[in-house]
A protein has these predicted regions:
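Active-site and substrate-binding clefts of carbohydrate-active enzymes
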Residues: 2-57, 62-108, 112, 221-527
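Acidic (Asp/Glu)-rich catalytic clusters
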Residues: 2, 47-55, 128-146, 176, ...
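CE4/NodB-like, metal-dependent polysaccharide N-deacetylase domain
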Residues: 163-188, 328-349
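Short, solvent-exposed turn/loop segments enriched in Gly/Ser/Thr/Pro and often Arg
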Residues: 61-66, 148-150, 185-194, 214, ...
Length: 527
């Protein structure tokens, strides 16, 4: 038995963005960047480890909205068009930078990366990256779990519990259809927990979820093992707490690994550095500057002046940081061993997009970490929450407290002056959806389609991504537009059903655009 265990959890999520009404849409690039920079690199890490017989165990939560986009043929085609543009742009960069050896080497690196992404996407994964996840689930390397249907921040919907239930119910059904397996765990979006949400988890046979550290540390009974073991809620659904030491080492913008000066600078991209005329063919609309993924500079320091990125120096630092992380975790579990009657558990949940997208070297670091952990598994072994609960089923029972991993630890990010206006509409929608389901209990044909689409629009409006963007001040007009659009669509369907004036042509256009959750059933909303 190992001295301690490491539970590594990667959360794969993006909001549902799909715009067939436009030939190209900037926000669809969120998905395309994540595929090229995070999802394919992570799957490649798993492929190399498997090929070399190196054991690894991870938990990956896949949000239903992301799964729907990854399987969507329309978005798969658009991703290939996106890649083809990048391959052409990288080829031009190789020619443009031929007189600058250091920059030219990087241009060649990007050309090779984009070309490899295309080959893997088409030939290996047959355009569907979910196949890669399913393979590693069946091999026993990954434990796949789900999250709420549209990544709703559940604590702000406890006043309409039918909405919380619907988010979890639709998520579980979507996961079964996607992965042909039942999820045993649940990722609370933003680790947003409120007392009582575990009742819906138990209703759908979800055995565990994750919370921020203080969700367990401030539970109604002081946790005997702190964050080093899960606790049971009163209904025996387990809550696993995020370890604050590892969160600081990896997440911190000041002292965390991703901020090292030799690593690649995220915010210097040729999409902003080169003259617009040189990029017209590659920018949305020919003039809207955006990230291309081609970046030539290292973080260097806080100032404007940046050194040219050196991949070899970065690779060396990756292994140093992986060694530091593993050694620190071994020391950590040894430090608390005297206070425990079981091996300490260190829970490390992360947004997957940190690895590769925000932190370019993240997949390399993860691979090095997994290799080093495998080599020292007598001291620190990988484990999934399900395995932990099988080995140590007797846990302390306590009631976690309201918490999230957002700024200041509660709900301030998703409920404040920039976004508080949405909730009166979202709560009213949830109540009106109940009204529709009761008033039209056994509809068929076009009315049933309308009711199911109303259900979809309600769920899409509840996504936590939109209030988050409003708070952070990034693509605010888009987040506001999406929220209003789904509220409008729902309201129009509601009004038309109440007045028997359904516009079929309009309904078909909305179904075609917001095309997800084909198994959705409005009748289940009040079941």
């Amino acid at each position: 038995m190992a001295s301690g265990y490491l539970c590594l959890v990667l959360h794969w999520h993006l909001p549902f963005v799909r715009h067939p009404e436009h030939p190209r849409f900037l926000e669809e690039d969120w998905l395309f960047e994540a595929i090229s920079e995070t999802y394919i690199p992570l799957l490649s890490v798993f492929e190399r480890l498997e090929a070399q017989g190196i054991p690894f165990r991870l938990t990956i939560s896949v949000s239903p909205t992301l799964a729907e986009m990854l399987r969507d043929g329309f978005l798969q085609e658009r991703y290939l068009a996106h890649l083809d543009r990048l391959i052409e742009l990288a080829g031009r960069e190789v020619r443009r930078t031929r007189d600058d050896l250091a920059i030219n080497r990087l241009a060649v690196m990007y050309l090779e990366r984009f070309t490899t992404c295309r080959t893997l996407f088409v030939d290996k994964y047959e355009r569907n990256l979910l196949k890669g996840l399913i393979h590693f689930q069946r091999s026993g390397n990954l434990d796949l779990i789900t999250s709420s249907a549209t990544h709703c921040f559940l604590p702000l919907f406890q006043v309409v519990p039918q909405a919380v239930k619907a988010q979890i119910q639709v998520a579980v059904r979507s996961h079964i259809r996607t992965f042909d397996s039942y999820p045993k765990g649940f990722w609370l979006p933003e680790c947003g927990y409120y007392p009582g949400v575990e009742e819906f988890c138990r209703q759908y046979d979800l055995d565990y979820f994750f919370v921020e550290s203080h969700g367990v540390l401030y539970a109604d009974k002081r946790p005997k093992y702190g964050v080093y073991a899960p606790i049971y809620c009163p209904n025996r659904v387990a809550a696993f707490a995020r370890d604050p030491e590892t969160a600081k080492a990896v997440w911190s913008s000041e002292g965390g690994y991703p901020g090292d000066p030799v690593y690649r600078e995220f915010y210097r991209d040729i999409g902003f550095d080169l003259p617009t005329d040189d990029l017209k063919e590659f920018l949305p609309g020919g003039e809207l500057r955006s990230n291309t993924g081609i970046k030539y500079h290292a973080i260097t320091g806080p100032g404007e002046r940046k050194r040219v990125y050196n991949p070899k120096a970065a690779e060396k630092r990756v292994h140093e940081h992986a060694e530091h992380f593993v050694s620190a975790r071994i020391e950590q579990v040894r430090r608390v061993a005297g206070f425990m009657d079981r091996p300490a558990l260190v829970v490390c949940p992360f947004d997957a997009e940190l690895f590769g997208h925000w932190w370019f070297e993240g997949p390399q670091w993860l691979e090095s970490l997994l290799r080093k952990t495998a080599a020292r598994r007598d001291e620190l072994a990988m484990i999934t929450p399900g395995e932990y609960l099988q080995r140590w089923p007797e846990l302390q029972t306590s009631q976690p407290c309201f918490s999230s991993w957002g700024n200041k630890g509660y709900a301030e990010v998703w409920l404040e002056g920039s976004n508080d206006w949405v909730y009166r509409h979202l709560h009213q929608q949830a109540l009106r959806m109940s009204e529709l389901a009761r008033r039209f209990p056994k509809e068929k044909g076009i009315r049933r389609r309308a009711l199911n689409q109303a259900f979809r629009e309600m769920l899409l409006a509840q996504a936590s991504d939109w209030p988050f963007i409003m708070k952070m001040g990034t693509t605010v007009p888009y987040a506001v537009r999406r929220t209003r659009e789904h509220i409008h669509n729902f309201t129009r369907i509601y009004d038309s059903l109440m007045t028997n004036s359904l516009d079929q042509e309009w309904l078909f256009s909305v179904e075609s655009k917001n095309k997800l959750f084909p198994e959705i059933d409005y009748q289940s909303y009040v079941a």
